[in-house]
Structure formats: C-alpha cells, structure tokens
C-alpha cells in the first residue's frame, strides 16, 4: 500500500491546539526526601538515665531562678518553702526534661514518671541523690562509680581508683561491660599498675606511678638512655648493652616467594617483586636476575627484551608483528581487519546523506513530526492573542487541510480509475 503522508495530521493539529489553549498553571516539583541515614547506635540505658537526671537537676535550678530573685527576701522565703516541693514545680521541671527529638529520654521518662513523683513527694529527705535512687537502686540501670556489670562488681584497682587512675574500666557505672582495664599509653597490667612494654618506672609511691619511654628499640629498660636497655624489641638484638638491627634477609627468618627478593628494614624486612625480565632475582632491576624470563635474553649482566619481530613470526597474509615487553603479537595491517582468524580487507562504505538509509514510512513520520511542531508553535502564539500569528496559524491549518483533502481525493480518483 502506498504511504499516506498526512493521514491523521488534522486531528493531531486540533488536539495540539486544544492542549496549548488549556495549559494548566505551573507545576512545582516537590523536593525529594533526604536519603535515609545509617541508624545510630542507641546509648546505654544508664547513660540515658544519667542525662535525664542531669536535665532534671538543671530544671530545679531554672525554676528557682525564674520564679524568685526579685529582692523581697522575706516574701521569697515564705513562698519558696511552699513552692520548693510543690506539684507545680515538679510539672514545670518535667516538661523541660527531654528535648522534642530525644526519643530515648521520652521513653525512659514515661516508664519512670511514677517513680520520680514518689521520690519528689516522699523520698527526697532519705535519698537526696536522685541518680542513685532512680537509676541505680530503683531501675537498676546503673552501678555506683568504680563498679560494673549486672552485680555491680568492683573494677580492677578498687572502687576508689578503678584501673589505678591510669585507665578506663569497661562498663564502669553501668550494668554492662567486662570490667577490663583499657590502660593509657605506657601503662599495663590487670589494673594498669605496671609500666608497659617499652616504658620504665620513672617514679612510684603508694598512690602515684610515672612511666616514661625507653630508648628507641628497647622493650625493657632501667632508664631513658640507649645503654639502659635490658631487652630489645622483635627484630633487634642486644649487643654490648645496645639494641642493633637484625638483618633478617641473611637468615632463615625471611620467607619471600620465588619471584621476590628481600629488603631489610629497621626491626623487620619486606619482600618485593622481581623485575618482569627475571626468573628469580637477588635484588631490584634486570641486572639482579638469577635467570632470564621467557622473551628475554642475557646481554652482559642484564636480561633484556628479545625482539621477536626480527624473525618471521607472523606468517599470515596481511599480518604484521608488534613487539611487546617479553613477547610479541600479530595484528592485521592497516586497512584490514581480523575475521575468522584471517585478515580481510575492510569495506569502507561510500558517504551517504542523513536520509539515505531511511525508509519511506520513516520519512512520512519525520514529515508529520516536523509539520506538527511548527503548527503547535503557531497555535501557542495565537492562543496568546497575537493577531498576526493567529492569521498565520489559521492559514497554515487551512493549507495543511487542503493538502490532506487533495491527497485523499487523488487516492479516491486513482482507485476509481483502477476499478476499486
């Protein structure tokens, strides 16, 4: 069937016009929601309880400061005695204890509000420390200072100076943790009561320990000088009261691979890869090879690349050789490409225009799109009340409609003549 270039074009133009005449107002894009951040680790319940009590105590100070301090001392003392333990003050304090975004605080306050009220009205005198009464004794979320774990066991070094004052007792003050002492640099032992590796006792008494660093590679020493070494760190050896570096590369301690060589460093060693030209080596570069790798040959004291392309290694028709480091490759000569293992001549197509490869139907679609865009643009300008463009638009629609009708008439006449 012959192509029908403008079939359906008039309905398309009418739809285009109605679309532009009924354009809605601007559509505002809503900002996309922020990406979900990684969940944060929840704080230990004891830390939440401590923060709640700290905020409660600040609220007590705030309510006194905001409600009194006007200068009339007698009146303030009379009113303060009534306000101090009143329900009004408690409500004011509790309202400001948790920030709006602190979910953990709000959850804990909801669970413990009755306990706080009981302490406020009945237990303040016998238990003035709200933290101890609420967090440790009642809710059992915390332990006294210097203790840890479900049973509030003493930290190493005792409750008065956990970890000797030179470390942190894991879980101290909470119902969790292992009680292990994380000692400061230079200190060691179960309760951080000793000097660690590489440090010596510079000062010690019944309550005080000062650990200072040994000289460089010393592991144990009696003082800061090099001659004070008693034991050396790994990779060093004590020689005439001094620590000297051990050359592991000359011993069985160095365990490098067959394609590596050993390099001594201070207190240790490292293995580095041999050069590509080497099949085993004693050092860096092609001049330290034990044997040459395939594709290399001994030239003097070095292993150098063999140029395989100097001999006929690419016998295929229209092939040429390219030398590479330690090898070679066969490629097709310029103007040829590889196909099924052989080099065939490339067929360079003659230059063709943009429309040369388009089918007739594709040309029809492109034609319709072009005319549609022009008419839609004219319709938009005409819809804005521009008389000139309105006239042009009406004329264009009329011309296109006439063309479409004439094409249709031609097809009807052609069918009649052919006896359709």
Curated annotation (Swiss-Prot):
Pfam family, one: DUF3456
Every EGF-like domain range: 153-193, 305-342
Residues annotated as signal peptide: 1-29
E.C. designation(s): 5.3.4.1
Spans within the Extracellular topological domain: 30-362, 406-420
Tree of life domain: Eukaryota
Cellular localisation: Membrane
CDD domains the UniProt entry points to: EGF_CA (cd00054), FU (cd00064)
PROSITE patterns found in the cross-reference section: ASX_HYDROXYL, EGF_1, EGF_2, EGF_3, EGF_CA
Cytoplasmic side: 384
GO cellular component term of the entry, any: membrane
Keywords: Calcium, Disulfide bond, EGF-like domain, Glycoprotein, Isomerase, Membrane, Redox-active center, Repeat, Signal, Transmembrane, Transmembrane helix
Purpose: Protein disulfide isomerase. Promotes the localization of acetylcholine receptors (AChRs) to the plasma membrane.
Name listed for the protein in its UniProt record: Protein disulfide isomerase Creld1
């Amino acid at each position: 069937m012959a192509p029908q270039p403008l079939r359906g074009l008039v309905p398309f133009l009418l739809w285009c016009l109605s679309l532009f005449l009924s354009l809605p107002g601007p559509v505002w894009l809503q900002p996309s929601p922020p990406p979900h951040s990684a969940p944060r680790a929840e704080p230990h319940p004891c830390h939440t309880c401590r923060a709640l009590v700290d905020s409660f105590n600040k609220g007590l100070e705030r309510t006194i400061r905001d409600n009194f301090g006007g200068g009339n001392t007698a009146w303030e003392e009379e009113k303060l005695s009534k306000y101090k333990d009143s329900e009004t003050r408690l409500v004011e304090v509790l309202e400001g204890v948790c920030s709006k975004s602190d979910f953990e605080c709000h959850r804990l306050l909801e669970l413990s509000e009755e306990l706080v009220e009981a302490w406020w009205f009945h237990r303040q005198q016998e238990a003035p420390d709200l933290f101890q009464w609420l967090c440790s004794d009642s809710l059992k979320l915390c332990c006294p200072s210097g203790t840890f774990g479900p049973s509030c066991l003493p930290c190493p070094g005792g409750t008065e100076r956990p970890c000797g004052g030179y470390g942190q007792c894991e879980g101290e003050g909470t119902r969790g943790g292992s009680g292990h002492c994380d000692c400061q640099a230079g200190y060691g032992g179960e309760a951080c009561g000793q000097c660690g590796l590489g440090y010596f006792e510079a000062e010690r008494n019944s309550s005080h320990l000062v650990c200072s660093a040994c000289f460089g590679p010393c592991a144990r020493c009696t003082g800061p000088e090099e001659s004070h070494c008693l034991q050396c760190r790994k990779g060093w050896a004590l020689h005439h009261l001094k620590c000297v570096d051990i050359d592991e590369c000359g011993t069985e301690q160095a365990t490098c691979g067959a394609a590596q060589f050993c390099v001594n460093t201070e207190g240790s060693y490292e293995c580095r890869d041999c050069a590509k030209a080497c099949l085993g080596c004693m050092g860096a570069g092609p001049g330290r090879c034990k044997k040459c790798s395939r594709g290399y040959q001994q030239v003097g004291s070095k292993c150098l690349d063999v140029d395989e392309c100097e001999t006929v290694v690419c016998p295929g028709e229209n092939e040429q050789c390219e030398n590479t480091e330690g090898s070679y490759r066969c490629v097709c000569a310029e103007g040829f490409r590889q196909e099924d293992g052989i080099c065939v001549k490339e067929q360079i197509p003659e230059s063709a225009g943009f429309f040369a490869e388009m089918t007739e139907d594709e040309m029809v679609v492109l034609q319709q799109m072009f005319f549609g865009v022009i008419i839609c643009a004219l319709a938009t300008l005409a819809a804005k009340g521009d008389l000139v463009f309105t006239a042009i638009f009406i004329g264009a629609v009329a011309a296109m409609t006439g063309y479409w009708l004439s094409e249709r008439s031609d097809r009807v006449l052609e069918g009649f003549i052919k006896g359709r």
